[in-house]
Amino acid sequence: MLIFLWCGAVCVSLLGAANIPPHPLNLINFMEMIRYTIPCEKTWGEYADYGCYCGAGGSGRPIDALDRCCYVHDNCYGDAEKKHKCNPKTQSYSYKLTKRTIICYGAAGTCARIVCDCDRTAALCFGNSEYIERHKNIDTKRHCR
C-alpha cells in the first residue's frame, strides 16, 4: 500500500513538473448535456464539425439555427473569460438533468454557474434546432466569411 501511495505521489509530481496543460474538465459535462437534449439517432460528436461555429474556432455568419447555438455558446465562453476571468474549458460545475431540462447549481455570478449556464443554454438550443446533414463538414473557407 505504501509503495502504491509513493508511486501515485511521484506520478502527480512528474505531471506537475512536466507543465502539462489541464484537460477540459467540463467537456464531459457538456457532452452529457448535449446527449440529454438531442434526438436519439444523433451523437454529440456529430455536432463537433457543423456549420461555421460548431467545433474549434469560428468565423463569418452562422449558417442556420443550430450553428447559431454554437455561435452564442462561443460568445458566452468569451464573456466568461473576459468579463468574469473564468476559464470555461477547465471550470468544473454541478448540474442535474431532469424532466427534459437542465438545472445548474451554484451561486449566481460564480465561474461555475456562469460556465454551466453557457453549456446548458447551448445544449437546450441544440435540442430545439434542426440538424441539417449538408451543414456537417462544410468548406468553412467558402461558406464562413
Curated annotation (Swiss-Prot):
Family: Belongs to the phospholipase A2 family. Group I subfamily. D49 sub-subfamily.
Cofactor: Ca(2+)
Tissue/organ expression: Expressed by the venom gland.
Role summary: Snake venom phospholipase A2 (PLA2) that inhibits neuromuscular transmission by blocking acetylcholine release from the nerve termini. PLA2 catalyzes the calcium-dependent hydrolysis of the 2-acyl groups in 3-sn-phosphoglycerides.
Binding site for Ca(2+): 53, 55, 57, 74
Disulfide bonds: 52-144, 54-70, 69-125, 76-118, 86-111, 104-116
MF terms (GO), sorted A to Z: calcium ion binding; calcium-dependent phospholipase A2 activity; phospholipid binding; toxin activity
EC identifiers of the protein: 3.1.1.4
Designated name of the protein: Basic phospholipase A2 beta-bungarotoxin A2 chain
InterPro entries per UniProt: PLipase_A2, PLipase_A2_Asp_AS, PLipase_A2_dom, PLipase_A2_dom_sf, PLipase_A2_His_AS
Enzyme class: hydrolase
Catalytic function, reaction form: a 1,2-diacyl-sn-glycero-3-phosphocholine + H2O = a 1-acyl-sn-glycero-3-phosphocholine + a fatty acid + H(+)
Species per Swiss-Prot/TrEMBL record: Bungarus multicinctus (Many-banded krait)
Keyword field: Calcium, Disulfide bond, Hydrolase, Lipid degradation, Lipid metabolism, Metal-binding, Neurotoxin, Presynaptic neurotoxin, Secreted, Signal, Toxin
PANTHER family referenced in this protein's UniProt entry, alphabetically: PHOSPHOLIPASE A2 (PTHR11716:SF100), PHOSPHOLIPASE A2 FAMILY MEMBER (PTHR11716)
Subunit architecture: Heterodimer; disulfide-linked. The A chains have phospholipase A2 activity and the B chains show homology with the basic protease inhibitors. The A2 chain is found in beta-3 and beta-4 bungarotoxins.
